[in-house]
Amino acid sequence: MEERKQKKPSSAMETTTLTRVPESERRPWWRLAFIWAGSVICIPALMVGSMVMAGMDFKQSCLCMVIGYVIVVFYMCLMGIQSSDLGLPCTVAISRAYGVRGSSFLVSLVIAISNIGWFGSQTALCATSFCNIMSGYLHIDFPLWLSCIIWGSLMFITSVYGVKLIDFLNRVSVPALFIMLIWGVIAALMRGAAAAVTVYQPPMVLGWTYGITLAVAGFASGAVTCGDYTRYGKNRKDTILSCVVGVLPAGIGALVIGGFLAVAMGNFDLSVVFSSFGFPIIGMLVLILATWTTNTGNAYISGIAICNMFKLKDGRRPVVTLIAGAAGTALALLGIADVFAGFLNIIAALVPAVAGVAIADYWIMGKGRADLWEPFEGVNWIGVVSWLAGAAVAKWGTFFVPTLMGIVVAIVVYCLGALIIKNEKINPIYAMNLKLTQTAEKE
């Protein structure tokens, strides 16, 4: 009797969500690098560049941007390697650091809210800019509500299909965005931008800490949840390459170009600059591609976080992602995204501190060994308390770069707690060391 061969699904829909990514589905580093490049080239990144430039000269600004992104990529690599080691997304990979319930009900909730909120904010920005270009340069009065629905839907539908379509989108869009970014700079230089940048003096003098803080904040949350993509990495080397090559050139480039355009042309938004040059269609392409490649990640990550909250089966991710994207679009449509900004600032302090606990748990106390890792049932209160301590420093701290200090505080508090508390029921690190000791004695 002949064995029937199982047909592989022809759909591009992603099928792995909370379970381990099989080796057969792992991807080369350069494909993940394209996803990262697409994530950091966005209109908000250009805006951050202009904000850094508002407080220091061009050379100082560029140096702050480089330092900020090097810091982000350093802890991004640590978070990313853990997920590639385990083959699990961020919210599952930290289920020892926070406990299974702590990861599900606390961290996943914060990550879901954060990314849905940013999806709504970016959709609103894209929709508004699109309408402005249509009316200002093409003399077409396009309804804002329709613009929100069209662009929001396009972005979250891409996320519904998962990493396969996101990968394809970025491989097509990133080269085009690089060409348009370079073209925009050259066009500005031909209009005398170099002279404006050379003689530029910032309207107010702000310290190095200010510039580095802004640069770090631009991708601080994205670096924490990078495991949702790096779980597809083949090994540690590939994960590091994807993060370094994907983020540093594109991320720093976007910040520098944003600052350059703000000084030279009076506007950081490259889409508006192109439109002012008489190329409104190119301006719209920059706007749409830059927002699309970034916003797909917001919906995708929130979908995975919600699946982890309710422990849904892998096959439910597409529906959950669709709902998350629709919720973000509704925020943009109802104009709540701007009102939501204050709440998002609090969430933004909570998300980076997640990395501190995860790094302390896996790399310092867990020795960076995947074979020693296992989820901890219930809530790991050592992790939760450390996270809140780090988040408080990130939100209200004033020393150096508060976001970075929040991560450091979370690391220190977790390590101290893991060393001091000697109870295997509430301390997974103590339980791990106890098992190692017992195994060594048996041998």
Question: Where are the model-predicted features located?
Answer:
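Membrane-interface "cap" regions at the ends of multi-pass membrane proteins
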Residues: 1-59, 72, 206-212, 231-241, ...
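Hydrophobic, membrane-embedded alpha-helices of multi-pass small-molecule transporters
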Residues: 29-45, 186-191, 200-261, 277-296, ...
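Transmembrane alpha-helical segments of multi-pass small-molecule transport proteins
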Residues: 36, 108-109, 135-161, 175-184, ...
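Extracellular loop-to-transmembrane helix junctions
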Residues: 51-81, 102-106, 247-248, 405, ...
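Juxtamembrane transmembrane-helix boundary signature
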Residues: 66-98, 107-117, 121, 421-427
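Membrane-interface loop-to-helix entry segments
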Residues: 127, 146, 150-188, 200-203, ...
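Hydrophobic alpha-helical segments and their helix-loop junctions in multi-pass secondary transporters
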Residues: 159, 175-201, 216-219, 258-263, ...
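C-terminal membrane-solvent junction of multi-pass transporters and transport-like membrane proteins
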Residues: 354-443
